[in-house]
Each structure stands twice: as structure tokens, then as C-alpha cells.
Amino acid sequence: MIPTEPAKITEKKYRFDSFGNGEVFAGNKKGRLPAMGWNSWNAFGSGNTEALTKVMADKIVELGLDKLGYKYVVLDDGCYKSEREDGKLSNEPVKFPSGFKALSDYVHERGLKFGMYNDIGTNLCAGAAVGTCGFEKTDAKSYVDWGVDFLKIDNCYYLWDNATFSNPENARYVFAPNIKGIEIRSSGAEGGFSKKISALDGSLRGCGASVKNDYVTGIGTFDGTNTGTTPVGPMSGELVFEVEVPEAGEYELVVCYATDRVNGCGEWLQVACDCGSEEDSNVVYDDLLVPTKSSEDFVESDAIKIKLCAGLNKIRLMNHRRQENTLCSYAAMLEGLNEAEPGHDVLLSLCEWGKTQPQNWGYKVGDSWRILNDITFRVGRDGDAGFGAWIDPGTPSVTSQYNKAVIMDEFAGLEKGWNDPDMLMVGMNGMTTQMSQTHFSMWCMMNSPLMLGLDLRRVQKGDELYNIIANRELIALNQDALGVQAKRIFTTAACVCGGGAVTAPDKDYITDCDRVDVLAKPLSDGSLALCFLNLSEKEKCGDFEIGVDLIKKYLGEKLPADFYAANSFDVVNLWSGEKTCVSADEAGSGTFCVKKLEGCGNVTLKICAR
């Protein structure tokens, strides 16, 4: 049954305050390296078929890509009937006549793994009314019966957020009302304690909430779907009041508020109280308030019962439901899989496009999480390779995805999961060989999932496309057992997105692509991968120099002491195969050096201490 309201949260593990505790939900296995495989969407959009999927599986084996780690064959949108049958998912009979179990068996017989797609909303992004919302247990049983190894789960038509194709008024669930003030008073006795506090006398915590006139607005989590906002730092805003009461006991909280159903002002309020650390914070109210006539028509709420300690207390007015609701929805599918097959090995790929800042909570339920909207909206079809862009002011480009993912290394790892800047566009129209090589280098250095998105019938062993997607040395960086995403340690950029000087290349969000970046990635054998990237479409010349001291500053103990103390280094260019040797004196003065980078080009080196 499709629910009529967001899930009631009764366990603290789903709460915002638990996002940073490192606890992973049951059934979400960790220790896996980034997934590698093929996904149908960029290649064929909704036009994928059973016949095409079988050919792609055969081509993976024929080309030897399976031996390089490409294991997953994933059906994206367009494979189901448009509506459920007897409450269950079923195959689109023209495109997938044999059914999903037969196709799964075909893929498994070739030593590969089988993946499918769905959505936490009511519908899939292409429109079919078969989203998992309310059907998680039923669908999980189907996926287990079909032998599914990988689930990509999207975020369209989501009921509890203003996501793609969702009702814009769903903003009511994910933002608190505008707040003018509060009153704290003794419970049930006249003449007792009473104190009114203006919102202007509260403190704003986090990011997003702001003062407007005499009230606070924007209490919630800001939308990360698009470019222009950093993924590093606080993603939510709260209004916090400090209240001192004479004695411990039950009090009443009355909130002066006004509602709307737009970004920044909603109807859902969460109230938490604590008299010590935030870990002791108790959510005492978590629901919709009665709507008001407008966002500036303030009224008083009904009294909310709260318990306070004698002395100083903090009262937090907030709305973390954008993140909490989405976590609950993905967790429902994970829990369904746990019930259908305890000990299952299904990999969950969360595709909510960075909307709810999944880098904060995605590790609890998933193996990877998308960080932005799609890398391309011009997908291919049978006979058409589709189009991929190098630069775009929105999300659909290599550099847009890279610019965000490159500063998200702190969120990734074997015990967490992987930032997902979407599928590879190697082989699409618009992507030159140089662009494709650099795109592949970026994704390998950043430990991104390597999901091919091209018609593999266009690839022959030894051709340009093959030599990119089958570069063993680059793949080895992505699949290195240490599982550490590269860190940007140098950039020629002067300004961060929105203005201001670059002060921390590993954390600053930079969107101006007229620059050179250098990424450093420690490897399990004690060596280092160093990647020089030209994000501009124009050639860049100069002495782009990286010294051991700079590497040590950013990587520290992630590299062994022997590396920093080495007398010389063997250096291999992982695209050209060229080998050189650099002495310690040279390295110390900064001569891991590249003097020229082609437009959209890269030089990716593996550096081993002698």
C-alpha cells in the first residue's frame, strides 16, 4: 500500500543526530571496492531490450572486460510493465519476453552479475507506476527470486520531498515553518514560570537558516541536486534557544510560526530538547503544524509538552526530514531484502542525485550514492551514441560532476562506500579521445563506480575505446585494496564558487574550469598515484610541480614513512607507459613536474619509492 504520510521515526538510528556515528544498518555489507560493470541508461535510455542486454553481456566476456573487473550488467529504467500486476513488478513483454529470471540466469551463466533499477517514489523516472514506495517487501522478494545482485534505486516521484516529478508542495515536509519566537511556561499551573523569547534572540546553527525581518526562515536541509553549493560542511540549518528554568519537570512550549509549501518555508516542525550534550537530545515533536494563511501570517501553536532540566537547556527547532525520510525509504528496501534473504549480497546503489546530501547518511544503507543530477540528459538509443559534454554550467558534464566529487574524499572508504558522480560517458558523441581518457582517469582516481554506458558493439579489442576502458593500470588505481579516494592537493584556480580565495584545495568547491588540478592517491603497495588534470578545453603550459613535502602535508600517514624518506622514485606514465626516475633532491624541490597539458588532458603517474 502506498503510504499517506512519512514514516513515524521510532528508532534513533534514523535520526539526523545519528548520521555521524559510523553505524551501518544490518545487511549493508562493507569492505567492497567500487562497483564495475555496464548500465543500459546512457547507451539505450528506456529503449533497452532483453536482446540488447544479452549482447552486452556477451561483449563484456568477448572483450575480456570481465577479467578486468567489469562484472555487473544492470537494467535501468524501461524494463517493467507500466503498472503492477497483482501488486507485483513484471517484465515489459515486448522488450523482455523471457522474463527477468531467465535474463538473470543468462547473465550469471557468463560469470557476470545481474542488476536492476527501481525508485523510492511511486513511479519510475520514465513514468511507469511501479516505484517501490509502499511495496518494498514485495519487491525485495521479487528481486531475490530473480537473482538480482545489484539494485540502483532512483528518487523520482518521491512523496515526501519536492524531487523530480514530485509535487512541488511537498516542500511542506522538508522545511520548518517560519519562526517568530517561542514561549516556555510551566505545565498545568497558573502563575508559574513563563518566558517568551524572540527568534532574533535564538542562534542559527549550521547552514541555510537566516533572519528575515523579525523572524527566521530556511530551517531545513538545502537541496544538493544541482551545481553551485559545496558538499563539504553543514548542510542543514536549525534555530536554537537557550532557556534557563528554575526546576526540572514538564513544561509547555508554544511556537509562534507561519507556514507555506515552498523551498525555505514548510509545515513540518521538529523540536528537540537537551540539558547537556547533543547526544542526549530528545526529539519531542515531529509532525506537521496547522497551516497558516501565508508565510507571514503568524499564529501560536498548540502547547507542546517538553521535559527540561533545572538550569540551562537548549531547545532546537529544526526539520531534518529531507534526509531522514529518504534514509527511511532506502532502509525499507534494505530491510525488505534482509527479510527475503538473510545474508543476501545485493549491492544498493543510491540514486537520489545528492538532493538530501547522502554523503552524510548514505553509508548506512548503500554501497554508493549519487552526488548530483544526471551526467547527461541526452542519452543514446540503438544506433545513436547519445551526447556527453565536457563542460556545462549545470550538472550534465564531466567537469560538473568532478568538481563536486573531488572534494568529497572524506566521505568515501571501504567502511563507508563511494561517491558516485554517475556513469561513464566514454564513447558518447561530444567526447573526444582526450576527454574520455581524462574522464576515466578522474573516475579511477576518485574511486568512483566504473559503470560503462556505451553500446559495446562499437568496441573492438585494441581500438581507442577499448584502450581507455581496459587500461589495467588505471583500473588498478580504482580497485586498489587500500580503498582511499584521491585528494586534490593543488590547483591553479584562484577563486572558489561564489567568490573568495582558494585556501584549501582539498575542500574548496571550485567551478571555474579554466584551471589545472593535481590529485594524489595513496596505494596499498606503498606507492602513490599522481594525476595532473587540465579542466580547460585549451592547452595549459607551465611548470606544474608537486614536491614530496606537499604530498606529505595532505596525505600524511596514508603513505608509509619510507616513501617520504626515499632517495629516488620510479615514475610511470599510466597512459603512455613512459618510465623515468626522479631523485629525492629533485622531488624535494617540487619536480614531479608536468610542463604541458593538452586541452581536457591529463598525465597520470604511478610513483614508487626506491
Task: List each language-model region with its residue ranges.
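Aromatic- and carboxylate-lined catalytic core of secreted/periplasmic carbohydrate-active enzymes
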Residues: 192, 218, 222-224, 228, ...
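Carbohydrate-binding surface patches
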Residues: 256, 443-453, 509-559
